[in-house]
A protein has these predicted regions:
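Conserved donor-nucleotide/metal-binding helix-loop-beta segment in metal-dependent transferases, i.e.
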Residues: 102-140
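Catalytic metal- and UDP-sugar-binding loop of GT-A-like glycosyltransferases, i.e.
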Residues: 98
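Short aromatic/hydrophobic "clamp" motif used to bind/position activated sugar donors
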Residues: 95
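N-proximal low-complexity "stem/linker" segments adjacent to membrane-targeting elements
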Residues: 1-22
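Short, acidic, metal-binding catalytic loop of nucleotide-sugar glycosyltransferases
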Residues: 23-31
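Short internal beta-strands
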Residues: 33-40
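A glycosyltransferase accessory/donor-loop signature
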Residues: 1-3, 7, 153, 167-330
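Active-site-proximal specificity loops/subdomain of glycosyltransferases
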Residues: 44-90
Length: 330
């Protein structure tokens, strides 16, 4: 099988991409291909990746001029990740996308066995479809509801920081289908490409364990989980409410030394000689203990998650009538 590991970066995120590839190489022992989706990166700045044997592909955001709105939380660059659904990616059997603000600690090989499309559930504070959306002030409630006719806004959503898919899902209609969703919902997403992908793969995705997309700084800073108790296949460090110290490359972040060590070792990447991957956990007992510690730490988040679902159901009934029109039953 031919498998591909992809990340995305602009010229300001190249160190993050190097660290990501280094962690995949040294920790996961990844034996497939590596690719950088490069957004507006000068050719000479891509030379390092090419010399390492990492594939590079120029990627432009979809409808860039439409996204210069302060409604969007994230840079338009991230919309370029949708290019992985282009038909020419069928030359690989499976594709794994990992955001460059992640650290990979353990093998990703299990993801290559994905039959369709897989991702981990979004973090509990925003894990419903409605919480991925933004209703413009000049849009009425009925117009907003009509936009999402056919979707259950209470539905659980996935996070796009890591996802994997079997390229059997790719055909000539997938990328145009995503483009169509982008056009229709370009001003309605808090996290643009995440909303679009959740609409496209609505009820057609397989949930991965949270350990494939663990929000490490959130657990450590917001839920007081000791750093040494935070372990997963992939640690994710997304921006959160513009707070400092949550990104793994911030020098005051608890995971900075790990991130910096991976970045320094990027210079030693040799894709002709893949190291043995890290062993994951010493046994099932340790794994079970880790899962329960995580659930206990997130008990408030789980409670909030289910409360939000109940509140949303009640609100939708009030807006749409009971039973709700144009919305799939939960």
């Amino acid at each position: 099988m031919r498998n591909l590991l992809v990340t995305l970066a602009d010229r300001n995120f190249l160190d993050q991409a190097k660290q990501l590839f280094s962690s995949v190489y040294w920790n996961a022992g990844w034996r497939g291909d590596y690719m950088l989706l490069a957004h507006e990166v000068p050719a000479h700045e891509l030379q390092w990746f090419r010399e390492k044997g990492i594939l590079t592909r120029e990627a432009t955001p979809l409808f860039a001029t439409a996204f210069k709105s302060d409604r969007l939380v994230y840079p338009v660059t991230i919309t370029s990740k949708l290019h992985v659904f282009s038909i020419d990616f069928k030359k690989w059997d499976s594709v794994i996308f990992v955001d460059a603000d992640c650290i990979v600690r353990y093998p990703l090989d299990a993801l290559t066995r994905t039959k369709r499309f897989s991702a981990a559930r979004d973090w509990l504070r925003s894990a419903s479809l409605e919480l991925q959306t933004h209703k413009p002030a000049d849009m009425t409630a009925s117009e907003y509801s009509e936009k999402f006719s056919g979707y259950n806004l209470v539905a659980t959503v996935f996070n796009t920081g890591l996802f994997a898919f079997n390229t059997s899902i790719l055909d000539e209609n997938v990328f145009p289908g995503l483009e169509g969703i982008c056009r229709k919902y370009h001003n309605l997403g808090r996290y643009p490409e995440q909303l679009w992908m959740n609409l496209y793969f609505y009820k057609r995705w397989q949930e991965l364990p949270l350990e494939y997309n663990l929000f490490a700084s959130y657990l450590q800073k917001k839920r007081n989980v000791p750093k040494d108790d935070i372990d997963g296949v992939v640690l994710h460090f997304p921006r959160c409410e513009d707070e400092r110290g949550l990104r793994c490359w911030d020098k005051d972040n608890e995971f900075y030394e790990e991130w910096k060590g991976n970045l320094d070792r990027a210079e030693l990447i040799d894709l002709k000689n893949i190291p043995k991957p890290n062993k994951r956990w010493p046994g099932a007992r340790h794994l079970l203990s880790g899962i329960w510690k995580l659930r206990i730490a997130l008990r408030k988040d789980y409670l909030s998650f289910y409360r939000n679902k109940l509140r949303l159901r009640t609100r939708l009934r009030g807006i749409l009538g009971a039973p709700a029109r144009g919305v799939h039953p939960g």
